[in-house]
Amino acid sequence: MKRAYAVSQYGKCYEQYCKEYLPQQAKEIFDKAEQYYKEFVKNDMPDLGENLMAKNMLDWFTILSFYEASDHKLDGEVLLNIKRKAADKMRFLGKFVNGNKSRWPCKMFEKTYVNFNKMKKEHQDKGEWMDTWDVKINPDHRTEGFNFYLIGCPIAKHAREHGYDKLLPYLCKTDHYLAEVMHARLIRTQTEALGGDHCDYWYVGDESPALAEYKDLEQI
């Protein structure tokens, strides 16, 4: 049976974790998570449209569903464990993508967000996608890597309004993991989850001289 939360990349990961570490409770957790997920989507889904950015909200609802279904056993530390394992399985990408040498991933990300901004404007002119993120491309005028801001995060808004503000920073922290697989690093100084007015992203190669300036920066 394909469950509703299977649309999220986290669904299968959480199921595998439960089967390994909570085998006696796994089936019950899956059933409860399914119901929680449906309720979150029905009652709490903002007007984000159908796009890659909107899938981030479905990931968040999946994480919350397993968190609640397990009586909070599947907490933030478990989320980091799950995401780290998923990233480790993708280490083969490092053979093909090197953040110190490859420019195409940055160009691809930039094109993706340029297209998103274009679609967002078209939809918002019609009164749609009104709750989605604002994306500012290279607001810090970086000449290296890829820099952008996400502003008005609907996930952070949901977390604050529903008492999940302690859980969300763990999800934000997982942004670092896939970058490391591709010999890159994420330099981030603030997130909305931790009270910032935006989430900043600056991806550079893991051999970048820029990292020296931020060597004491906590991964958030």
Where are these regions (language model features)?
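N-terminal, charged low-complexity regulatory/assembly segments
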Residues: 1-73
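Activation/maturation switch segments at domain boundaries
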Residues: 6-14, 189-193, 198, 204-220
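Hydrophobic, Leu/Ile/Phe/Ala-enriched alpha-helical segments that form helix-helix packing faces
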Residues: 18, 66, 70, 123-124, ...
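A short, structure-level motif marking secondary-structure boundaries and short turns
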Residues: 50-52, 159-162, 211, 216-218
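Amphipathic interaction/junction segments at domain boundaries or subunit interfaces
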Residues: 58-161
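Short, well-structured alpha-helical interface segments that form or flank functional binding sites
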Residues: 61, 65, 174, 196
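Secondary-structure boundary elements
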Residues: 73-76, 141-142, 178-185, 206-212, ...
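Short, hydrophobic/π-rich interface segment
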Residues: 134-194
